[in-house]
Every structure is written in C-alpha cells, then in structure tokens.
Amino acid sequence: MSLLPHRLFLLVPPWLLDPDARDFINRVEAADGDALENGVKIAYSNFIRGCKADGIWNAIKASCILAGARTLSGALVPLVGTAPTNLNFVSGDYNRRTGLVGNGSTKYLDSNRNNNADPQNSRHIALYSSTQATTPQYYIGAGQTQAGSSLISRSDGTQSLVRLASNSTTTGSALTNGLNAISRINSSTISVRNNGNTINYANTSATPLSLNLFIFGSNDSGLNSPTSARFAFYSIGEFLDLALLDARVTDLINAIAGAI
C-alpha cells in the first residue's frame, strides 16, 4: 500500500524545522520506511534548535536519540557523527517512548567514537536513563581502571563510579532516571550530573585511552559488565554545560512521549 496519504497527513511545513533537524528526520524516515508524527518531528527540531541557542550543539560529536523513531533501525540513525554498531539488539528491545533496553549480558552498542577523539581536557559523555540496572554494571565506557579511561558505572544502589580521561575513579551519588553525565573543562576537575544536580569533583586527567566507547557496557578490549538499563539518548563529545543538556534532553523525551 502506498505511504503517500500517510506522509501528506504527517507533513510539517519545512520552515518550522531546523535545517539539521530536517536532515535528521529524512534519514530516520528512510530507515523506518515511514513518516514520523508531527509531534516527534517538532520535538527533534526543538531539541536541535534549543541546543544551538544554548551554545552546546557543536560540542555533541556522536549521538543517537534512542526514542521517537518507528523502528530500531530508525533509532540507530545518528543525530551527529558515525552510526553506532548494533551488537545483538532486536526490535523487541526498543520502545518508542522509553528507548532501548539491555540484557546485562550480550547486548551493547559500539559508538564507533574513540575515547581519544576529543581533547583530553574538554569532553563529555552522557546518557538519558529510563530504567536503572539493579546490579553493578557499566552504562557507557572505554576502559576500566586504566589511566585515561572514561566511564559511567552503577556501583550499587547508593553510589556510582565515574571516570573521564582520568587517572583515578571518582565515587558519585546513586544513578537515577534522567540524565547521567560527566563533563571535563580542565585537567583537575570533572562535573557529574545526576538526579537534576551537577556536582564538581577533583579528578586529574590522563592521556585518553585509545578504545571506542561502548554504550550498555564498557570496552575493556572487549565487552565488560554490560547493563540491563534502558536508555533513550546518548551523547559523546567535547565539554558542554550539563544542566543545559539535561533540560533539553528531558524536554525532548517528554515531548516524544506526548506525541506518540
């Protein structure tokens, strides 16, 4: 059956959408084989336009919005950068409103962005969690305890472990649903965002370990401690304001849920 009537019904006037959003939407719809709802298109556009207004868009170097698309293939279309490699996820793991869920054993994404691709003292990694793991697991990472590793890990129900091109591991608060993120602006401090709060920690940088960052686990020259959490967004890149990113991603996920 022709998709033309569906596409006409879901047409958004081009001038309402950010140019980068139009490109992203076209690629997602091509992967899905179908048009997106008006509300999803506008949510994507508002997110991109808002990130540009906040001055954080250019710092995002590798990212996927793991929500909104009609199919898993569409969800893995990169917002920015190279597409991730899907290792073992299937369509049943994907929910348009809440994102992609791991199984804690075999399923992960290779971001295809090397941990050393961003400057040692200007970088961030971020995830939007819809559901948390219940056991110690890596959410995103390259390395483990080696100097220059970068990671976000659930340690237990009361704390998290984080590194960002670091010489040592920092213990943070328990991971909660929403944005879980780290940024680094200099050689001595990292900022950790969780539960709507940003806390700065003393943490000395090191030459970034040369491994691709994995999502739903850490790349320790192979998959290490994968997670069963569910994520609706990830971002990797240069330093940015985590509070601004948090606000934009939260609005994005809420708008997608309301549009479907």
Regions found by a protein language model. Give the residues of each.
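Polar, enzyme-active/binding microenvironments
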Residues: 2-260
